[in-house]
Amino acid sequence: MKLMVSSVTKMSNRHQVREKAVKTIFQLIRPQVPVSLDQACAFALEAGNDPEAGFEGSDAYLDRLVQGVNQTAEELDQRISHYLAEDWTLDRLARIDLAILRVAFYELLYVSEDEVPSKVAVNEAVELAKTFSDDKSKQFINGVLAGLLKDLKN
């Protein structure tokens, strides 16, 4: 199902796509006001964009990430939980960190290594943490993803 968003920017690279995906997923995690997937995506796509730049339509990989993460969120959360320290739960994670982890786990588990090498998925997640979170979160996200990578290689 392609997202129906009337005003969406054309993504110029995968990093921008991942930023928009994380912003979309973030809005769907424990929202104070219920929001639909289309509303969250529209807001994420329009946030921070110059209206003069023009709008040309959604990126196929953005649609794939957002739809995929949304459809597999429960499984992704179970897998993420497996890599958290014993005294940590998903509810203790910052919403932005959970959004970054969901996108990264989705890429590592559901996107082929040929399309997105695991090293790229991890590096992108760490870069997103640098942008949207703090140094502790960056290290935490890197550690969680390192655990998943270790298991995927075995």
Question: What spans do the regions from the language model cover?
Answer:
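N-terminal interaction/assembly modules
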Residues: 1-131, 136-138, 142-154
